[in-house]
Each structure stands twice: as structure tokens, then as C-alpha cells.
């Protein structure tokens, strides 16, 4: 599996402390970095799907707007901007269990 490049870092990543999985592909990360900063470093801008099925990007970056909700290690609706990366973490963007389930009548 090809590793995702971090071409959009503000400053080049000097030392990768770990690898996480982003949408099934490995990407390097540094200790103390947030999930959102890793996502944005790869160039991905639309990170979530809201409860209406629309694609949204991170807005505030500080946990207030809830526009960066992703699935982390199987748990839905985690704020990417408030979650620090951990080795082996599995991150899935554009996932929303509300819009992925079929409505029941």
C-alpha cells in the first residue's frame, strides 16, 4: 500500500514519530499533532459528511463548530481538530453513520 504524501504542510515534517491509517492508506504523523493537521497536510479539504449527506470541511479548528467529525478507530463523530494522533490509529473521513443507515419506517 502506497503511503500518502504530506505535500501541504506549512513547515515540512522534520521527524515522523508514527504512522496512522487515513482512509486505509498509511500516512506519517508527529507526536502532539492533531488528526486534523495530518488530514490537511495530505491536501484533503472536505473531511466530513454532515447529517444531511453534504460534504463539509473543517471550519474553526478548535472544536466549536463540529465540522471536522471523522471516524477514529471505529468510533463515529470524533472531532479531528481535538484528537491527538496515536500510533496505528485508524481514521476514516467522509463517514457519517446517520446518512449511511437506511431509514426505517
Swiss-Prot record:
Protein location: Cell membrane
Binding site for [2Fe-2S] cluster: 60, 65, 68, 81
Entry keywords, A to Z: 2Fe-2S, Cell membrane, Iron, Iron-sulfur, Membrane, Metal-binding, Oxidoreductase
UniProt keyword annotation of tRNA processing present: no
Signal peptide bounds: none
Alphabetical list of CDD domains matching this protein: fer2
Enzyme class (EC, first level): oxidoreductase
Reactions it catalyzes: glycine + 2 A = hydrogen cyanide + 2 AH2 + CO2
Functional summary from the UniProt entry: A three-component membrane-bound flavoenzyme that catalyzes the formation of hydrogen cyanide, a secondary metabolite, by transfer of electrons to a cyanide-resistant branch of the aerobic respiratory chain. Contributes to suppression of black root rot of tobacco.
Name of the protein described by the UniProt record: Hydrogen cyanide synthase subunit HcnA
Organism encoding this protein: Pseudomonas protegens (strain DSM 19095 / LMG 27888 / CFBP 6595 / CHA0)
Native organism taxonomy: Bacteria, Pseudomonadati, Pseudomonadota, Gammaproteobacteria, Pseudomonadales
Gene: hcnA
Amino acid at each position: 500500500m502506497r503511503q500518502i504524501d504530506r505535500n501541504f504542510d506549512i513547515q515540512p515534517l522534520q521527524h515522523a514519530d508514527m504512522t496512522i491509517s487515513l482512509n486505509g492508506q498509511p500516512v506519517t504523523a508527529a507526536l502532539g499533532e492533531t488528526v486534523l493537521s495530518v488530514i490537511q497536510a495530505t491536501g484533503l479539504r472536505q473531511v466530513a459528511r454532515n447529517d444531511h449527506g453534504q460534504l463539509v470541511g473543517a471550519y474553526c479548528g478548535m472544536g466549536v463548530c463540529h465540522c471536522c467529525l471523522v471516524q477514529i478507530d471505529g468510533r463515529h463523530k470524533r472531532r479531528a481538530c481535538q484528537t491527538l494522533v496515536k500510533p496505528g490509529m485508524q481514521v476514516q473521513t467522509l463517514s457519517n453513520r446517520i446518512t449511511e443507515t437506511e431509514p426505517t419506517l
